[in-house]
Regions:
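P-loop NTP-binding core
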Residues: 1-270
Length: 270
């Protein structure tokens, strides 16, 4: 079971979109995938989970982390069929929000290990776990980094997209030093990319420089800017279910292939 966190401590760079599409792309390749929503906005849950499945009274990742509830009882299947399995460990906006988790956990010595402990219950069940994270350096983010084998960093072709990279490197370095020495940066993924524009070309060069500083790679396929992604979110579905022939779907599928070349886990490592 390979655990990957989608992380950037700047908001609006495509973290949740990348988590959704990577999880769906892996499931489309016949693998068993668990998507974990660690973002208080719960947008991954709203996209992949059937309406009401994570509503009032339902177990969510909050109860798993704060109360020690069995994570297997909180998992719900995706609302849309795939060739493999796509399940979700959901967040919720309807009752106990992840935004108050810091207060619930306090300074417990295991506060950064709650998610990794919960995910151990799924060994032998899933090929991949994909974690969506908040744009913050908080207990949620450190739980994700402590649980992860690898990190994918989405970044948009803008002057401000790189703002979250330096603090993220510090967070990863601290995680490696204190809670999870195995975590590595798998690569940087360019999102919302407008081919042929001067800004995108300049930022692609800048992202390559960032990757070199981080000791990692830039994935070969940037994710094209397209309205189909926003439309798929409005339809509460992944891009492959919404329009498998659009440029973003092709790009995310190509990225998934490159991701698997980096991490393995093609379905035989369960």
């Amino acid at each position: 079971m390979i655990i990957t966190a989608i992380v950037n401590q700047k908001g609006g760079v495509g973290k949740t979109t990348t988590a959704i599409q990577l999880a769906a792309a892996l499931a489309n390749r016949g693998m068993s995938v668990l998507a974990v929503d660690m973002d208080p906005q719960a947008n991954l849950t709203g996209t992949l989970v059937p309406a009401g499945a994570a509503g009032e009274g339902a177990l969510t990742v909050y109860e798993v982390l704060a109360d020690g509830s069995d994570p297997r009882a909180a998992v719900v299947p995706s609302a849309h069929p795939h060739a493999g399995v796509l399940d979700v460990l959901p967040a919720s906006l309807f009752h106990k929000s992840l935004s108050v988790l810091d207060a619930a956990i306090g300074n417990n010595p295991d506060r950064y290990h709650r998610l990794s402990g919960a995910l151990r219950r799924f060994e032998g069940v899933y090929d991949h776990v994909v974690i969506d994270t908040p744009p913050a350096r908080d207990t949620l983010a450190y739980n994700a980094l402590t649980a992860a084998d690898g990190v994918v960093i989405p970044c948009e072709p803008s002057l401000y997209s790189a703002d979250g990279i330096a603090p993220l490197k510090d967070s990863i370095d601290q995680t490696k030093a204190y809670t999870n020495p195995r975590v590595e940066i798998v690569g940087l993924l360019m999102t919302n990319y407008e081919h042929g524009t001067i800004v995108s070309k300049r930022m692609r060069s800048a992202v390559r420089d960032m990757a070199e500083c981080l000791g990692t790679r830039v994935f070969d396929t940037p994710i094209s800017h397209t309205t189909a992604v926003r439309k798929s979110q409005a339809a509460h579905t992944d891009i492959f279910t919404f329009d498998a022939k659009c440029s973003a779907a092709r790009d995310y599928d190509a990225f998934c292939g490159q991701f698997l070349e980096c991490v393995g886990g093609d379905g035989d490592g369960r």
